Structure formats: C-alpha cells, structure tokens
Amino acid sequence: MPKITKIEVQKKNKERFNLFLDEQFEMGIDIDTLVKFNLKKGQQLEAADMAEIQKYDHYRIGLNKAIQYLSYKKRTEKEVIQYLQKEEISEQAISEVIEYCYREKLIDHQDYAESLKNTMIRTTDKGPKIYQQKLYQLGIEPNIIEMFTELYREQQELDDIIQIAEKISKTKKGPQNKVKEKVMQSLIQKGFEMETIHAVLNEMDFTQDEAVLDDLLQRDLEKIYNKNRKKYTQQKLISKTIEGLMRKGYKYDKIKAKLEESGIADGTEEIE
C-alpha cells in the first residue's frame, strides 16, 4: 500500500502542496484537501483513498477558479459553467461548484438582473427589449427576466428616451415624415417598444427649415437624375426621378416644382 513520504509547499503557490508517495511525486493538492483528509507523512493510502483525494482536489481547483472569475464582476450560472468548461473542469465538479456558488450567494440571478438594469438605464441608450435579450442570452430564468424587464420599463424615464430620440433626429436630414421614420427605426433597433416609441414621437417636433429642405431636395434631385440620365429616355428619367424622391419622403408637389425650377420638366409630366 503506497505511503506518504513527503508533503511540501509548492514554490509558486503557497496555498498548494506537492504530495509524494513512496518518494515519487504523486499530485498537487490545496490546503483544504490536505486538511479535509488529514494527510500527513507516513500515512498509507489505498487506491480508493487516492481516487477520493483526486476527485475532491479537482473540485477545489474548479471552485478556486470560479471564485477568482466571480471576483472581477457579477456572473450568471451560465457564464460560470462555460468558463469552467473551458478550464477543463469535469461536469461533476462543475455541478458541485455551482451548488456552492448559489449557497454562498456568489451567483444570484435577481441581484444580477437588478444590477444590469440599473447600469443599462444609467449608462446606455438601450430599451427594455435589448435588456431582456441580454438576460435571456445569459441564461437567466424566464420569471426573473419577466419581472425585471417590467421594472426596466417602469424605471426608464420617458424624458430620457425623448432625449435619445432627439439626439438621433439631429443626425438625420430630409423630409419630416422620413426623419420621423428613421428615428422610429433607430428606436426599434435600440430595443424600445412601439407604444413607448409612439409616445416619444408625439412629443417631438420634426419641423425643419424650409430653406434647408429645399437645398436637400435639390441635392437629392441632382443625385438621382444624374445617376439615371444615361439609362432612360427623358420622360422615363423624370418619372424615375420623381419616384426616387418620393421614396425619400419628399412631397409630390415640391418635387414637381423643383423639377420645373431646374428646367428639367415643364409641368405636364406625370409618373408612369
């Protein structure tokens, strides 16, 4: 039966020990393993004893890795499991580590959801759908997702969302209805819900300076006209130009007036 002939502190990690059986290095163990099994020089170990020691120390390695991983920031169960799998910790040990983390409140999904909610509302321009999606991707339970997404909706101030929308609006140029449409699409992409978006849009003023709009119309007209002038006959070209400008949100009467002002049309042309 193998006998412990030496136990020495590792040089690079004072919390771990080298275990020697019959003068041969057998394995490294941590101090908790040493204490749990009351290991000491001269002690004889059966194969079953060694299997238990190895199993427990593997768990301890996984636990220490998890604790260190959790020390940097809050994590979910899914994140910890994925991390330990990459660290080649066994599924059995991972299961025991997760149980320990829940028991000691190192993993707490409600606390995680609360913290993420507060951070996102305070520091991002994202709505509840993005928050909800993040929780889902992180493996949070559906009932917690539902509860905290509702809190997100309640706690995100409408005035703050209006400010987000106005910031978007300042980067968009063009006819009022088109700018409004672009703002709406941006808010959808940021995770806001349609009921909230409509409430925000109703509070905003999308009126733009007529001179600015006139310049934009002239610019877009020239761009579309010049792009297609070699492809179509004059009548078809005018029709395509009108269609293109209407898709950009310009009103038909404004387009016709600008075409006549530019000398491109004489006022008799219609869209084909």
UniProtKB/Swiss-Prot annotation:
Its main location: cytoplasm. Gene3D superfamilies: Winged helix-like DNA-binding domain superfamily/Winged helix DNA-binding domain (1.10.10.10). Pfam families: RecX_HTH1, RecX_HTH3. GO terms for biological process: regulation of DNA repair. Transmembrane segments: none annotated. One of its GO terms (cellular component) is cytoplasm. It is found in: Cytoplasm. Keywords: Cytoplasm. InterPro entries: RecX_HTH_1st (IPR053926), RecX_HTH_3rd (IPR053925), Regulatory_RecX (IPR003783), WH-like_DNA-bd_sf (IPR036388). Modulates RecA activity. Belongs to the RecX family. PANTHER family: REGULATORY PROTEIN RECX FAMILY PROTEIN. NCBIfam families: PRK14135.1. This is Regulatory protein RecX.
